[in-house]
Amino acid sequence: MLGSSVLRLFSESTDNAVTGSVQSKNSIRLLPEKIRNFVIAGIDVKEADLLTKLLDQVQPDIVINCVGLVKQLSDVNDPLVALPINSLFPHRLAQMCASVNARLIHISTDCVFTGKKGMYSEDDVTDAQDLYGVSKRLGEVDYPNAITLRTSIIGHELEGHRSLISWFLNQKGAVKGFKQAIFSGLPTIEIARIIRDYVIPNPDLTGVYHVSSEPINKYDLLCLVADIYQKDIKIIEDHQYKIDRSLDSTKFRNATGFKP
C-alpha cells in the first residue's frame, strides 16, 4: 500500500531515477501501467544474495523500506514469519545500504505502543504486548545511514480489503465508528511527499522520528472519508472501544519545518 504510493510519487519527476522491487510478477499487474517499468520482480527480501545483487546493480543513494507484515495478516502472529521480516530484515538492509553508501529510510508504526496514554513522544517507552508491535519495535533502525519514521497510514490497497479505507468503502448498511479510538496517521501519498520534501533534504536525520497529523477519532475519520467518497452508509457512534496511539511529532516538525 505504501510502496505503490512512494513509487508513484517519486516516478513523477524526471529528477529521480527510481527503481522499485516486488517479490511476485503478479504484483506488477496491480500497479498503474505508467510505473510498471520502474519495478523489478522476483526480489524476495529473505534472500540476502538477491538484495545484494539488486543494490550493486542499482547503486541507490536512498532506499525506502516499505516491506513489512501488517497487523491484519494472520501470519503476523507467527514468530517464525513475523520476526525475520519485521525485526531482522530492516537491520540487514541497513548494513547492505551502508556497503553501497546509501541512506535507509525505514517505516515503523504507532503500534509499538499499547494506546493507553496517547500523544506518545520518541522518549516514551514502547510497551506493545502483541507480537506485531514487538516485532516492529525490534526492527527500528538507528544507524548513521538510517532513519526510522514511526507513523500510521491510511490508503488504498492494491488488492484486498484489509486496510481501513478499503474495508470501509466495501461495507454496506451500517458500521461502527469508535469515538474513543484516536488516530494521528496520514494518507500513504502524504507520507511519500513527506519523505521527498522533508526527510531526503535532511540527510543528517538519524534514529527514530514520529510523523503524525493532528489527532482525530475513528468516528469522525470515517465520517470524513464517507463525505469525500460520497459513501452512503450509516456510521454508528461507539464509545466502548478505547485506544489512543496518537503520536507527538514535535521533534520531527522542529527538525524539518513540517506542518500537517
Region spans (language model):
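SDR active-site strand-loop-helix element
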Residues: 21, 66-67, 104-110, 114, ...
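A short helix->loop->beta-strand "cap" motif at the edges of active sites that frequently abuts
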Residues: 100-102
